[in-house]
Amino acid sequence: MIKNGTCPYWERDDLSECARREYIEFKFPLFILLTGMIYAFCKVFRAFYLRGKNHTNEAPEFEEQGNGNHEYARFSVLRLKSAWESRSFCNVNNRSTFDKFKKFIEGAFIVLQLTIHLYILSSMPMDNKKFFHQGFLVQMFLWILLLVVITLRLISASQSFRWVLACKRDLWAVSFYSYASLFTLSILPLRSVFIGKIKDKIMVKYIISETFIDLALLLLLSTSSIEGTRYSFLVENENKKLPPAPTVFGLLTFSRIDRLIWKAYKHCLGNADIWDLDINNKSIAILANFEMSSKKGRLLPNIICYFKAVFISQLFLAFVSSFLNFVPSLLMPRILSYVNDPKSKSWNLVSLYVSSMLVSKIIATTCRGQGLFLGEKGTMQLRTVLISNIYSKTLRRTILKDSTTSLQKNASTSFEENPDSSEAEPRKKSSRKDNSVNNVMSIDAFKVSEAMNTFYLACEAVFMTVTALMILYSLLGWSAFAGTFALLAMIPLNFWCATFYGNYQADQLILTDKRTSGISEALNSIRVIKLLAWENLFYQKIINVRDGEIRLLKKKATIFFLNHLIWFFGPTLVSAITFSVFIKFQNQTLTPTIAFTALSLFAILRTPMDQIASTVSLLIQSFISLERIQDYLNESETRKYEILEQSNTKFGFEDASMEWEAAETSFKLKNISIDFKLNSLNAIIGPTGSGKSSLLLGLLGELNLLSGKIYVPTVESRDDLEIGKDGMTNSMAYCSQTPWLISGTIKDNVVFGEIFNKQKFDDVMKSCCLDKDIKAMTAGIRTDVGDGGFSLSGGQQQRIALARAIYSSSRYLILDDCLSAVDPETALYIYEECLCGPMMKGRTCIITSHNISLVTKRADWLVILDRGEVKSQGKPSDLIKSNEFLRESINNDSKNTTHNQIDLKRSTTSKKTKNGDPEGGNSQDEVCAEVENFEETKMEGSVKFSAYKWLADYFGGLGVVFVFTSSSILIHGITLSQGFWLRYWLDTGSSGSKSTWLYRIVEGHSNIYFLLTYIIIGLVSSFLTSGKVWIAIISGTNVTKKIFAKLLSSILYAKLRFHNVTPTGRIMNRFSKDMDIIDQQLIPNFEGLSYSVVVCLWIILLIGYVTPQFLLFAIPLCALYYTVCTLYLRASRELKRIDNINISPIHQLFAEAIKGVTTIRALADERRFITQSLVAIDRSNAPFFYLNMATEWITYRVDIIGTLVLFSSSVMIIMKAS
């Protein structure tokens, strides 16, 4: 009996009447009344006071000052958010009509409760039962408060009470809090009624009616959409599918995804079937919030600051879940005591213990699911933050002169594992190779984001360890500290393993960078590789780097084996030491009740030990990847927004000296002073290597300005510019010497974000000599150009890049030798009709060229460069008279092109050349046919058996897999024998003897014999289990080596047609993220699956052996488990496939941004490309988000089924005992 003064809390097997009246009926309802009333009053008063005032959550405006803000305007997500919202369709997921009708039912139930209380209160005899009267009065006032609350919720739709909307969610929270609290309080009185402790008929009817009305109200609110929350969705079109409005029940049990899972069960899912993300999970909202909460500095503190609310929530949920997970262990000694002696406790009390086990496990499972889902949602958000920051950095990063190496250099040195340190070190310090940036995004960003899942597991592990040790101390006394010290002694071993694992991981990532960089270079140069038959050379170089990766993977497998061995053998060692101290030094009797309760705690301890080991390992990998991301984000950025000065009258240089950032050569542009003529054609000539391209890049602000000034018409973002009356904007367009095209159609590449005007488009196509080519293509302007223009000839690529600059609304054009890849006749036509034609009216054009006679023919201003210096400049006619070298160069060019003079009519041009390419270029029949735009597809339905057999064949066949699985059954049988041995030891009664413990003889054996055998069984089991894992990983590593070699060979030796229609980003996704999954997740996950299946089968067999009646429950539970798993497998399979497909466009965007960053920045089009990346990220996040929700959906249900197994087996055991 538990007492509190004169009022006992508990009487034998039930709550006392005094406690029920004082606490259940009075004090707790009074607390609910006061807290609910104060909270509701404050929220309603605030809403009423602030009525009519406009409060928004808009981001604070920033002051524009200094040149640095031009960069902020281009890259700030806060600036981008408003533009995004204005262009997107905002849909609100409103409450259904049935949900609104439920509120009237809710009000009717509240009125019914008030009526019942008034009736009982009026008919109650006035006596000295103070708490009885007070309790009814308090509860009546509480129901009056809830009636007021439901009334306010009902009238919130009225225009006269619109201010109530501001606190509608708070009012709903008060109702839910009250219903849930009252129903919880009514459970114990209802139990008292069922076991016959309450005899009064009126009270019995009252308690039953109150409980079921409270339950009805709670169910009404739990299954209705949450009020006061607008779930808005920013989508590209109004037909995008939206998820159902969330309910409390749906959020807690993840039932919100039921419809999607059922749809996936009936037919295959596509991108159109995936629900959109609500606005709070959109990348634009995530980044805007992150930007507002972040400060300049390292990434880690900003991440912690942004996710602090998530961390605090996970900390609380982990605490609750960890404590409740031990409730079955705390109740187990009492249940076992009843099993040993049914007369020691009443059936009612033991049934309460079993029910408490069920309830505690359900609540613990719910808390754990919510904590893990918070981590998974945080993973998605952190991944969004990292990928977006890396992409934004790519658009801001300084370009390097040596960023693009020659193919010969790549073939000879790119894959060397130990390059000369004298050459490698400066490069390492200056910048990461462009081709390895994709690796930072695809591997490092994902590894860092996965660390969000580990925080909850780490907190849970710490809480579970502390709680288990506390319970062990209460059970075993100070001998539990002996086990604790043994546990602490293992921590240095874990950290030692983690340190080595981290070092190997860092080395592996370096080799992965080299591998992906080499593959990217090979894909970008695949035409030349096939032309020179270098496939075998590149294959061997990449395989050599891959072999280094495989060696490191095997070293990591060895460390994993040691860590696994510590994890498995730890509980055995700890339990052996604890039991030894308990028996020998404390001189206590080790009974089966104590032993198996302690063993259950040690078994629970194994989970946090595993979590700590895996968490440390994952955190080390994450910190290594985070450092790599931080190093990339710390790389030097372009200073163009600082060095360029805006001027409406000047366009050029004033005594400017410039150099390349981190250049390997000492080349500089020295003392450049040029004032380009506005609304004119300006030409720059000079010998090869004189600095013409560097000069144009300097004008764009891409070089490092050492001294002087650079004047440009604008430094503002493209979206912020105003269109003039002539349709032009005061901006620049750039056409590089090497044409840069995006994967898309010809129209996409030419229009490039501008408003499409068919007449203007046709004029540009004609002036750039593209109209004949387009007519020859089946799809016309909708023809896909392939990855980076791969399907087009060099001349076509350059003319499309030129057409993009001409079609743009920019008033200033910067063209870098844009006619070098076309034949002389086409070059002359483009020069006359395009660069000197009506398309250039009112525009300023700066062009560099080696064709001196062509560009000087009609140029208004000529600049001659030599060795980085301006030798002369002026009108071409004046320079020709005064410069003999220029005069001779023009005469030589004129002699060479005399026989190519043509009539400027288009008919003659098309007869002499194909595609406008120089003689010997790719023919139109070869490269200009319509290129189909193949979208990445996915398999449908279940994974075919042939796929499993294909993987099994790499292992050595299905026989090897069968032997491996069978060994798991045998090994776990050995593990279970340890428990049987302990039971046999205890049944011998050896611990009850008074003789010397170590040499006590029972049935011819001493206690040391039993103890050593117990330890040996645990050690053998641990070695076999860990060895099986090690063999599996080593074998899997050899398998991944073969798979990679097969994949690489297929790609390198594929026909050009395949490369024409397959974007590089899609291929890189296979070699980066997919290969990383195969390397590090496939085999461990398979081994974990086989282990779990074996353990599950053994548990069912053992429970069935001990309690055969359990099999009656096992059959429906197994059927339920099969149904749940079948539903999940189909949904998860489809979602994983879609998720994997939707990542490829992100890879493609990165590849395009790396190649075309100069063009993008010149066009001031960074904001549009960032928007495209955010759309791609959202497209990838949607299936990832719902895949995680589906994972928690099945995890929750499987845990509930496991809880039902525990509950049903416990019921069978106590029924058998009674």
Curated annotation (Swiss-Prot):
Ranges in the topological domain labelled Cytoplasmic: 51-103, 152-169, 223-302, 375-449, 505-558, 606-953, 1035-1082, 1133-1197
Residues that hold ATP according to the record: G686, P687, T688, G689, S690, G691, K692, S693
Domain annotation ABC transporter: ranges: 651-892
GO cellular component: fungal-type vacuole membrane
GO MF annotation terms: ABC-type transporter activity; ATP binding; ATP hydrolysis activity; ATPase-coupled transmembrane transporter activity
Keyword terms of this UniProt record: ATP-binding, Glycoprotein, Membrane, Nucleotide-binding, Repeat, Transmembrane, Transmembrane helix, Transport
Protein family membership: Belongs to the ABC transporter superfamily. ABCC family. Conjugate transporter (TC 3.A.1.208) subfamily.
UniProt-recorded name of the protein: ABC transporter NFT1
Annotated source species: Saccharomyces cerevisiae (strain ATCC 204508 / S288c) (Baker's yeast)
Phylogenetic lineage: Eukaryota, Fungi, Dikarya, Ascomycota, Saccharomycotina
